[in-house]
Amino acid sequence: MRLPDFPWDLLAPYKKIASSHRDGLIDLSIGTPVDDSPLTMQSALASSGSAPGYPLTIGNATLRATLERWIRSKFFTVGPLDFLPTIGSKELVGLLPTLIQAKKVLIPEIAYPTYQVGALVAGAECVAVGDDCREWPKDADLVWINTPANPHGRVLSQSQLREIISWARDTKTIVVSDECYFELGWDREPLSLLQVADGDSAGLLIVHSLSKSFNAAGYRAAFIAGDPALIAQIREVRKHLGLIMPAPIQAAMRAALDDPAEIAIQKERYRVRREVLRAAFLGAGFTISHSEAGLYLWASRGEECWQTIEWAAQRGILITPGIFYGEKGANHVRVALTATDEDIRRAAERLA
């Protein structure tokens, strides 16, 4: 199997440059949370440490009850629905084409690299497509959409989502919406694919994660929800493969979803950091595109992205080249908001 190079390995020389800055490295390249996980999650994990038996692939009864309340209240109030907890969202993204035996997968032309990798692992053809679904190939098995999108933070509108659903129904294509940044709307509040499905989840799936909104990337806690027939197909394969969320993590996930106030607390932290970084990058001559939701600024100096990466590294700041996400990102860089308040302040000072 021939896979692309792991993108972040290519940043090593620039990390070395940035690390040599007299005041040290400020890493804004990877969207990994730095704030503490909620105490409710930590307590639930600690009190569930004794787990001698095998957990259920579908999730235990208390987690399932919580997940259904969460999904119904936020995304899909009526209509047939099923869901599964997953071991983070990345493994689900990487394995889903295999689990549903997809032969042709459509991904956004600027996209999270794991969409492509998942198609390659499945032996499927992978086609990058633009925004207009009327121009998409009609013979695909699976199409990934991402709203809010990583890396550029674009939010798909209600009309765009409805058009995609209509296209999918006409072409009998499965649509999976990666909504892992759903709770982090800034200039525009995101909509879930299921929110505009009029109670019909057939052929539709959504993926959500606790990693960013609850500072829980280390827990590997996420879920997939939607069409009961598709969830049943995915569940059966996952049962055979032993892809099961550990019982203590199920307990922590349930505790988090039962305490949604934590989302607002963390969102406010990111809002402040975003304002500081946005002003600093604009002041340094960058333009910022989209970035209306999510954990990143999609920025450009009007030059090839590796030049910008080196420019930032000379100032002790490590950011991500847009080319990692597709050829269309070649003149942009992605700036993560996931640094401490102090590091965000220091980065802004270096850009001044």
PLM regions with names:
Residues 2-88, 95, 256-257:
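N-terminal small-domain helix-loop-helix segment of the aminotransferase-like
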Residues 51-167, 183-199, 205, 344:
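Conserved core of the PLP fold type I
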Residues 77, 200, 303, 314-320, ...:
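PLP-dependent enzyme catalytic core of the Aspartate aminotransferase-like
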Residues 107, 128, 177, 319-321:
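Hydrophobic residues in well-ordered beta-strands that form the structural core
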Residues 122, 170-171, 200, 284, ...:
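Helix C-cap/helix->beta junction micro-motif
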Residues 198, 202-271:
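Conserved core segment of the aminotransferase class I/II
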Residues 250, 254, 270-278, 288-300, ...:
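Conserved glycine-rich beta-strand-loop-beta hairpin in the small C-terminal domain of fold type I
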